[in-house]
Amino acid sequence: VTELVSRGLLRVVEFADLHLKESNTIHSFDSLANADEYTYNGATGSCKQYYQDQSNGKYTPHFDVIGPVVLPQTQAFYGTDAVGVSGDDQYIADFVIDACKGAQQLGVDFANYDQDNDGNVDLVYILYAGHGQADGGASTCIWPHAWDMQSALYFGNTKQTEFFVKTNSMGQIISQNLPVLDGKTILRYACSNELVYRSNARTSIGTICHEFGHVLGLADLYRTDGTDSKEVPGSWALMSNGNYLNNGNTPPNLSVWEKYFLGWVEPDMLVKNGAINLPADGKTYKMLNRTSIVPNEGALSTDTIYYFENRQKSGWDTYLPGWGMLVWRVVYDADEWYYNTPNNTTTRFMLVTANGSTPYTNNLSGGKRQDVPFPGSWEVTEYQPYSHTSLTNIAEEDGIITFLFTNTASSIDNPTIDNMFNQVFDIKLDGSKLKIKGTSHNVNGNYSAKTDVLREL
């Protein structure tokens, strides 16, 4: 297994009128981000440990923690809600620009933070003094989020005129001037707060891991349009509100699809009749609604696909609401993931519940926590994703899930699967020769969820 190590900047910033707590030193934030063993306030590990574990050692982020950078403006200047919209920080573009310029003044060379040589700074993360609006902070607090400077400048979240994005009536960019430091463009970024909830306790890793998930290409699984939905995964998923489990100290493991999307696991296809063993932290499975085998397009397939995994209350999953077999239903849409709206207009990423309820009612406390997984408290022993497939005799013993898989479609009794797992191709015409070059997964910046997958030539 080849380990990919990414290097990014974590800028710790203070406002003109608000400073870090004296006990929250740069060293303490470096430990939170990078320590091999991080247990402060009951933490299960550091941000680095979390992503090492999610990738089974294939990916290790390292953060150069810089600061504190003292920003020229007050917290309220950057963070006050624009036109009364909660979470829409009025001058967030200026916040990012000032944080990056301040880091440069401390000696940071941004040319060292473009590992994929695409001209953009990688892994821009800002941790700001005080509270965040998302977990009880005032409307003048910045809402922890991930975004990009093109959008922030286009929507006018700035008070200066040096940097801008202009579009025509069709919404196409006709001119822009993005911040460039040491020859590298500041484009995508993420940020979160120093203090958790309304207390004065130092932040935990949960929200940082959530926002860093956006940097890697993951989308929010709650509804980002501000409306309520009881079909979102809730505390069962880091990218919903699982980042708050154990006061943010123990975010849950990523779902099997998210690991698949990032190139860290490859689920087996459920196609052939027989008994299936599903151990925790072991094999995972997926199922397509097809009666014949076609090339597998990987996590970017636009089919409705079901994913099956065994999740037990240990390690990063210690504080999950329950345990057993989780069934995820995913309908991938590149545009919806790119714009961070997979569950807004319709539910494209959902957790199927054993008793037919909604995961939202089984969240952080109360509710019937074992209603979600199979077999669960309702002892649900059967599930039929499609008319021609069924899972029967679902059982759990000693943390291992077993079931009998039946597929009545005769054309796939003995399938052969041509796996094109998550592959993206660069196609170039060189004279009379067509050159096709495959690239790897998006954690190294080679492609994003917006990229098309080659289907046929």
Where are these regions (language model features)?
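Fold-level signature of zinc-dependent metallopeptidase catalytic domains
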Residues: 1-32, 82
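Low-complexity, Pro/Thr/Ser/Gly/Ala-rich linker/spacer regions in secreted
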Residues: 1-4, 405-421
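Active-site-proximal beta-strand/loop segments in catalytic clefts of secreted hydrolases
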Residues: 11-16, 127-131, 218-219, 241-244, ...
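Non-catalytic C-terminal accessory/binding modules of secreted extracellular proteins
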Residues: 21-61, 65, 69, 136-198, ...
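Acidic, glycine-anchored loop motifs typical of Ca2+
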Residues: 110-123, 297-300
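C-terminal outer-membrane/trafficking sorting elements
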Residues: 416-457
